Amino acid sequence: MTSPSTQGRRGMLALSVACALALPLGAHAQSSTKGSTREQQLEQRVNQLEQQLAELKAMIQEQKAATSQATQTAQAAQATAQAASTKVEAAPAAKPAFSSAPGVSVALHGFISASGFGQDKTFTYGNGQNAEIPAVPAKANSGALSGVDVRNTRFWLDFTGAKLNENWSGSGRIEMDFFGGFNGTGAYAQQQPTPRLRQAYMDLVNASGGTTVRVGQEWDLLFPLENTPTSLSHIAFPLGFGSGLIGWRYPGVIWMQDLNHGADGPKWRLDVGAFEGSWNGPGSTINYLTAGNAHFQPQVEARLHVADKDWLAYFVVHYASLDMKGVGNTVAKPIKDSINSIGYELSGQWKPGPWTFKGLIYSGNALGQVFGAMSQFGDISETGGWVQGSYNFTPKWSVNAFYSMVSPNKDDVVRWVATTPTSNALLKDQQAALSLQYASGAYEFGVEWIYDKLRYQTGPEGERKNINGNQVSLNGLYRF
């Protein structure tokens, strides 16, 4: 801004210039006798005014320069302040939570699970969150017990964004829980559960063609991954596992193809998988020396799947060939030289209004490697299944009733399992469960009761007996 004193000086100079322009007119009115003197005076005055005019121009240029500099300084200050404000606002999102390969995003998900439980018997697979079938013989495994179990707690990393080419994109998952045993057997080992790998696979997806190829360790096609029984206590080991519900995780490859990709109505899909062969011997079960690993004999499965808005159904077939002599023919005279593992499964789910009904039935033989026949291995034929009904009487409260049963051929079980006077052959099992659950946001809480009745026989000629067990649990779960 120009000061008042400067404006005054500029006004006086302008007035002087105006007067100077008027002086020549007055000079023509003077007499000739005074002409030369007057001309000299006028010339001096003009020179003086020209000097003042030059000073005025210099002052104007100085004021313009000062104004420009002030404007630039103000603009720079405003830009600095704006940049500082933007930096402060953007600071919380400066770095991603996870970093991976360029173009690949990583997401961490999972849940924390805790169950306080009481039992009147010891169960097989374990007590607490993996209790399934009462352990035998009855006398050695009776007695009440209680505890708190958190081993269902699970987390996984999902990787997305990778590209194979223009048509195929990629993704993957690594999944862990805490059913990997314990840190030793000392007094404090039970409070130190060990993580275990559940799944580790990569997906190649052709979205335009409705094709997915999955490679790695994943659930086989018999396991009802999208149709498991509802429970807050039995998650890693679902209700009825080995007692009407079968399936297991194996390394392998699955090809999944949409059959009516992009069409309206029910969605049809065909899945075909080949998985690592496995059995309970005769060689090492952790060094690829079982009857399922002998030669090249993968487990082969196919599943036809259909789903709509409130229902789904699928049918699965399973086949594997087992060399009972083992790798390198280490067993000279097995009960049978070879076994064909065959299974058929039909499963479904329906959600009419507040109700949910789901279940499955299966039949086959030699299914021990997928938790068939209560995890008994041999050429054992069996039939089993489970059913569950759930009712949401409010958006947050629900009640669930469950029943499962497995009935292997008793003669087959005795032949293959009860080979010594102290061997226990599990002949039939029935399991029932009832739960009340409350869910709100990321949290779920519930109370659950499980009852299991087992019929068994000790030794090839032993008496057939019944044993039952109960578990009551209070459960909480937080999803993230």
Feature roles, as predicted:
Residues 428-455:
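Extracellular low-complexity, Gly/Ser/Thr-rich intrinsically disordered linkers
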Residues 2, 19, 25-125:
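N-terminal periplasmic/intermembrane-space "pro-region" immediately following the signal or transit peptide
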Residues 438-440, 466-480:
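Outer-membrane beta-barrel "beta-signal"
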Residues 94-280, 296-297, 301, 305-312, ...:
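Outer membrane beta-barrel
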Residues 2-14:
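Bacterial N-terminal signal peptides that target proteins for export
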Residues 295, 302, 306-434, 438:
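Detector for outer-membrane/organellar transmembrane beta-barrel domains
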